[in-house]
Amino acid sequence: MDAEQINQIGATLADLSARTADLRRYLDYDAKAERLRTVNASLEDPNVWNDPKKAQELGREKKSLDDVVVTLDRLTSGLSDNTELYEMSKEDGDMDGLQSIADDAAALETDIKQLEFRRMFNNPADPLNAFVDIQAGAGGTEACDWASMLLRQYLKYAERKGFKTQIEDETPGDTAGIKGATIKVEGDYAFGLLRTETGVHRLVRKSPFDSSGGRHTSFASIFVYPEIDDSIEIEINPADVRTDTFRASGAGGQHINKTDSAVRLTHIPTGIVVQCQDGRSQHSNRDVAWKRLRSRLYDHEMRKRQEEQQKLEDSKTDVGWGHQIRSYVLDNSRIKDLRTNVEVSATQKVLDGDLDVFIEASLKQGV
């Protein structure tokens, strides 16, 4: 190992340390570490299992936090130790030690790249589970077979990622394959990883269903959307609510007109206004007004989610055969993404679920 190689190890460690520091800031390490301590304390409470749903939610949150906090702790510690060892090994001329440090640095960089990749998830729904709809297009039996190949491809991809899958719906083809299917994919960032797969996938091959061995072109559409949690917890930040009091009008005797017992609440972010003047005291009117505000915000959230779901459905109908995103030409051993121009020749690996090169390129280019 010459002097240039030795110096390069030091430069690599410095670069990795700087990237790790950037990740700590970007991923809000301090806040996540504090939240992880709170979640761990909650999970250690035996009473948490009295509410299995809450316990499961805490378990999922812990895993997500661990992925960031524990990884950053390991990176920070590993880089600090290796930097110290590097200076000692360099001074002592310990070539074996320097090689070991170089190997450790390569392993640490792999973890850093995974965290840096997570920075590309900028959609609020990215961390959620996903549904993958597969629909056979034009091409009859050949298209149905192609749809079944894609079903297998995404199941294999999910398996590679350690995701849990369930086929929610499957319609068999008349002769072979499937007319359509829906897969539920459960795991951290399942939607974020799969969302760029939405579009039309085109297959060109010599059909096994054509005795003459003719070349056939088939299509299938993929539509990926997030699983929206049905539970809606309305949390109102008091700072977002303006409270006004005024003298009530109407029935209630003389008392109701002599004091500012009526209460009006304005939820500033949404513009929703509620008021109550039925009670004889400001305290009771305030309680009722807050209950009404929560109800209004619940309704507002439900309507917003319905609108978002409708947008998803509308975008689904827009996926026509002209919206091709990827071409699989098996005869020529070529699969090409038409948006990123990424092209691979290992067609069987892709059909076996090795989609990382396509998905990463799509996320990096903001497809």
From Swiss-Prot:
GO terms for molecular function: translation release factor activity, codon specific. Methylated by PrmC. Methylation increases the termination efficiency of RF2. InterPro entries: PCRF, Pep_chain_release_fac_I, Pep_chain_release_fac_I_sf, PrfB. Keywords: Cytoplasm, Methylation, Protein biosynthesis. SMART domains: PCRF. GO terms for cellular component: cytoplasm. SUPFAM superfamilies: Release factor (SSF75620). It is found in: Cytoplasm. The modification N5-methylglutamine is found at Q254. PANTHER family: CLASS I PEPTIDE CHAIN RELEASE FACTOR, PEPTIDE CHAIN RELEASE FACTOR 2. HAMAP family: Rel_fac_2. Peptide chain release factor 2 directs the termination of translation in response to the peptide chain termination codons UGA and UAA. Belongs to the prokaryotic/mitochondrial release factor family. This is Peptide chain release factor 2. It comes from Variovorax paradoxus (strain S110). The lineage of its organism: Bacteria, Pseudomonadati, Pseudomonadota, Betaproteobacteria, Burkholderiales.
